Amino acid sequence: MPSQRKSPDQKRPRRSLSTSKTAKSQCHSITSYFNSAPPAKLACSTCHKMVPRYDLIRHLDESCANNGVGDDVQVEPAQAGLMSPTVPTSDLPSGPLENVTPQKLSPPKRSLISVQCGSKLGIQQQTSPYFKDALVSKDQNELPNQSVEIMPLGSLTSKLSRRYLNAKKSLAKNEGLASQCPQTSPSTPGTSLTDNCPEMEDKDEVLNSSQKENIYSCAPLKEENASEQKVKNNKITGDESQKASCGEPALTPASAEHASILLSSDSTLVSNTKSSPGDTLVKQESARRADVGLAEPLEVRSHKEVQMTFDAAAKTLVSGEAESNGPTDVDMSDMTTWSNNQELVREAGSVLHCPLEQGSSCGGPSETAQLALSHPYYLRSFLVVLQALLGNEEDMKLFDEQEKAIITRFYQLSASGQKLYVRLFQRKLTWIKMSKLEYEEIASDLTPVVEELKDSGFLQTESELQELSDVLELLSAPELKALAKTFHLVSPGGQKQQLVDAFHKLAKQRSVCTWGKTQPGIRAVILKRAKDLAGRSLRVCKGPRAVFARILLLFSLTDSMEDEEAACGGQGQLSTVLLVNLGRMEFPQYTICRKTQIFRDREDLIRYAAAAHMLSDISAAMASGNWEDAKELARSAKRDWEQLKSHPSLRYHEALPPFLRCFTVGWIYTRISSRAVEVLERLHMYEEAVKELENLLSQKIYCPDSRGRWWDRLALNLHQHLKRLEEAIRCIREGLADPHVRTGHRLSLYQRAVRLRESPSCRKYKHLFSRLPEVAVGDVKHVTITGRLCPQHGMGKSVFVMESGDGANPTTVLCSVEELALGYYRQSGFDQGIHGEGSTFSTLCGLLLWDIIFMDGIPDVFRNAYQASPLDLLTDSFFASREQALEARLQLIHSAPAESLRAWVGEAWQAQQGRVASLVSWDRFTSLQQAQDLVSCLGGPVLSGVCRRLAADFRHCRGGLPDLVVWNSQSHHCKLVEVKGPSDRLSCKQMIWLYELQKLGADVEVCHVVAVGAKSKGLG
């Protein structure tokens, strides 16, 4: 276009906008309205300089003399009046906003702060520098001198949205507590910081009505009884009933208010689940100091229990609350209370300290706060992980001095060096061309940063690239083709892998000129020319990378229980920290109690990390269909495991509870062997698969929850593939006698035994079926409907054609078999329906049992600040450790009327909405009203029965629940439906759940969908 080819100075002037008679008489086409060229330069709204139109944003971010005013808004205490004793408390909003639902994705609103707080609290309104009228000046010399903060270009709106939060943190931490609380001194241990800051609580409630626990708040502690209750709720005082919280006797829900509810028949099930501002203050400070390294190193006592020791500031903080109960000693030997919300890691970057020598990029506390705020999200997350390790003495013992020196060198890197290393660390461990590195937010020229990382031992450059396979992988396909032409390779136009194979074949050939011993070989010539073609390249050094990978593995240890990919070193945990940092993820509030040491020494952790990486490689090979590679990896892992079976550390692992034993090397190698069975079956190597299964079943220490699947696969291989009928029958008998064989696998073994017993070929083995335990499952109601099947090619779920809309405007839509069934039941009078399978019931169970799931007093089930469930949720110890509380709650649910069920679900929903929990899917229901309608239709007996089965054996019972839940909102009639499409049948777990639900009194049925042709709709 002409506007693009001409410079702004050469463009024609703006057309006249005059509405004179002459102009009106002219008739123009519509294109004339788009020919007015914009001005070449615009006046900056801040400094009033004439700036090129295309450089206005860059000028505002980098060059404008007054942009510091908008970036870093300094609110003086005298101006704000937040903590001034002259401000009357009657003008402040009073009362906690307890009924406000926390919003997971809602950041603090600037308009709310400006309107509500500016008038009452005297806070200067935070206005973007682009719209500050106070800065308008016609004389450039009149502009005040402002400090200019150089910020990397990025999302401008994201920078603006964080400015008020950063200014507020700076006020609260650096100015507010020091200037407005002068009475507090180390000589007065009975006075806390909160006694002199009564206004902060009301200020906090106004600023963060929906997530008030996320901001540092100071609640007044004038009433002795109130402060005592708050301290007891947070387990801070030395109360005798709470000192054994990590021992066996004390079992309390996460809130003290729940303790009296468990054994009472009161209609209030979950009362005041959200912590008060005073509670949150102590919880949040505990978590912040533990998570980012402000606390002193953790001490491991003789009973191997982790103790959190607060620094002087923290002791002053809790001294006023502890005074009401007696002496000022605060017993934190049993547990440390963590408030897991998104603000903790968000504030972590501003309080990170570098406990290292001079020369580090983090100079001191004041410099650290300013520097960390400028760090990008990925570096802040990485530093949070490092500080969590440095603050835990038990974890620090798992690294030797050389590895600690690597951490020290990382802190000594410049800010750009740290950023680049974290970026490269998160990428795949392979060689990277320097020309492919583009991180403008780090530096426009990365060469000095790369040299710094190389000198510090974190990077390798092309001088150390000596493997031909690595350099060939580094080249692109066109570069490989060009290189192939120079060596006259046949078919240089092939695929990249074919060219790589051709080069490897050429490199193995012997040189024709055998008399020249000093002449380089063919491999060396290929390597040199390939490196010249690739140019400068680099790779992260394996040694330091392995150290940081182990740190991440320790930090994300609890995630690897279900997430197969978490075995790759905890890379995904950085994403979790990032989401928490951005306020997009919030975890429940629970108490961390680390009593048992999992890894005895450094070598134990290294062995576990090696096994975890092997499991990750095997899983990746299986996912890509490389079964031969997976088989070789599994055989290599088996050899390593055979050498470790006599190691003395295994005896220590055997004594661990199952929910901690899963973090041992033996457990990982057992999972690898279980994967090897699937690989061998895929390759039709059934003899080897049977031997592997027999080895797995010969031990009962590792992976006991998988024994049902192992017995089932062994019986299938012996019966179907190897035709060893007698061995198959004996296998079934032993499997049915195994107490670890549960639910679906138990029924599957029994059904196979029945088929074998009725088979004519097994008549001579009838004596083996004597005393076979019977597994009885009753049948339920079945209905059949028809649906027009949409023609499709390939495998996959069936797609049906369904009529939608009213009679006047009918439409044809494509739907799944479950959606087709929902339409059928909608026509049958059920106006509400959900296709959620097990998530529907687990969400209701999680809401009704929330405080018991996250209750205090059970050691080692919560070990870090990023857990969505206790570690023992998938084991039998979950119900056993909480039996008294669960039995009382289940009886309460069983006899509760519909109004109480609705109220309990509503209270838990409003108090916990958005927090990440394994059982709860917040998007399963369209609203709280829909969830309340469903619980009132299901009733107490059905809900208590479902909750009991899920709590007793969540691992084996979470699957198999009905697909649909439909109900009539007027008659409160509810139906649970399992939908089966063409050529689909019920699984064993589904049969058991339907039978159990029917026994509980629920209306259940199986809806079979029979397909008919769709040619009448013209879709053939």
Curated annotation (Swiss-Prot):
<dbReference type="InterPro" id="IPR033315">
    <property type="entry name" value="Fan1-like"/>
</dbReference>
<feature type="region of interest" description="Disordered">
    <location>
        <begin position="1"/>
        <end position="24"/>
    </location>
</feature>
<feature type="binding site">
    <location>
        <position position="64"/>
    </location>
    <ligand>
        <name>Zn(2+)</name>
    </ligand>
</feature>
<feature type="binding site">
    <location>
        <position position="963"/>
    </location>
    <ligand>
        <name>Mn(2+) 2</name>
    </ligand>
</feature>
<dbReference type="GO" id="GO:0000724">
    <property type="term" value="P:double-strand break repair via homologous recombination"/>
</dbReference>
<dbReference type="Pfam" id="PF08774">
    <property type="entry name" value="VRR_NUC"/>
</dbReference>
<dbReference type="GO" id="GO:0008270">
    <property type="term" value="F:zinc ion binding"/>
</dbReference>
<dbReference type="Pfam" id="PF21315">
    <property type="entry name" value="FAN1_HTH"/>
</dbReference>
<dbReference type="GO" id="GO:0045171">
    <property type="term" value="C:intercellular bridge"/>
</dbReference>
<keyword id="KW-0464">Manganese</keyword>
<dbReference type="InterPro" id="IPR049125">
    <property type="entry name" value="FAN1-like_WH"/>
</dbReference>
<feature type="binding site">
    <location>
        <position position="979"/>
    </location>
    <ligand>
        <name>Mn(2+) 1</name>
    </ligand>
</feature>
<feature type="zinc finger region" description="UBZ4-type">
    <location>
        <begin position="41"/>
        <end position="69"/>
    </location>
</feature>
<feature type="compositionally biased region" description="Basic and acidic residues">
    <location>
        <begin position="224"/>
        <end position="242"/>
    </location>
</feature>
<dbReference type="GO" id="GO:0005929">
    <property type="term" value="C:cilium"/>
</dbReference>
<keyword id="KW-0863">Zinc-finger</keyword>
<feature type="region of interest" description="Disordered">
    <location>
        <begin position="269"/>
        <end position="288"/>
    </location>
</feature>
<dbReference type="GO" id="GO:0004528">
    <property type="term" value="F:phosphodiesterase I activity"/>
</dbReference>
<feature type="short sequence motif" description="KEN box">
    <location>
        <begin position="212"/>
        <end position="214"/>
    </location>
</feature>
<dbReference type="GO" id="GO:0006289">
    <property type="term" value="P:nucleotide-excision repair"/>
</dbReference>
<keyword id="KW-0460">Magnesium</keyword>
<dbReference type="GO" id="GO:0005654">
    <property type="term" value="C:nucleoplasm"/>
</dbReference>
<feature type="binding site">
    <location>
        <position position="963"/>
    </location>
    <ligand>
        <name>Mn(2+) 1</name>
    </ligand>
</feature>
<feature type="compositionally biased region" description="Basic and acidic residues">
    <location>
        <begin position="1"/>
        <end position="11"/>
    </location>
</feature>
<dbReference type="GO" id="GO:0017108">
    <property type="term" value="F:5'-flap endonuclease activity"/>
</dbReference>
<keyword id="KW-0479">Metal-binding</keyword>
<keyword id="KW-0378">Hydrolase</keyword>
<dbReference type="Pfam" id="PF21169">
    <property type="entry name" value="Fan1_SAP"/>
</dbReference>
<dbReference type="GO" id="GO:0005634">
    <property type="term" value="C:nucleus"/>
</dbReference>
<dbReference type="GO" id="GO:0140036">
    <property type="term" value="F:ubiquitin-modified protein reader activity"/>
</dbReference>
<keyword id="KW-0539">Nucleus</keyword>
<keyword id="KW-0540">Nuclease</keyword>
<keyword id="KW-0175">Coiled coil</keyword>
<dbReference type="InterPro" id="IPR049132">
    <property type="entry name" value="FAN1-like_euk"/>
</dbReference>
<comment type="similarity">
    <text>Belongs to the FAN1 family.</text>
</comment>
<dbReference type="GO" id="GO:0008409">
    <property type="term" value="F:5'-3' exonuclease activity"/>
</dbReference>
<keyword id="KW-0269">Exonuclease</keyword>
<dbReference type="GO" id="GO:0036297">
    <property type="term" value="P:interstrand cross-link repair"/>
</dbReference>
<dbReference type="InterPro" id="IPR011856">
    <property type="entry name" value="tRNA_endonuc-like_dom_sf"/>
</dbReference>
<feature type="compositionally biased region" description="Polar residues">
    <location>
        <begin position="180"/>
        <end position="195"/>
    </location>
</feature>
<feature type="compositionally biased region" description="Polar residues">
    <location>
        <begin position="269"/>
        <end position="278"/>
    </location>
</feature>
<feature type="short sequence motif" description="D-box">
    <location>
        <begin position="14"/>
        <end position="22"/>
    </location>
</feature>
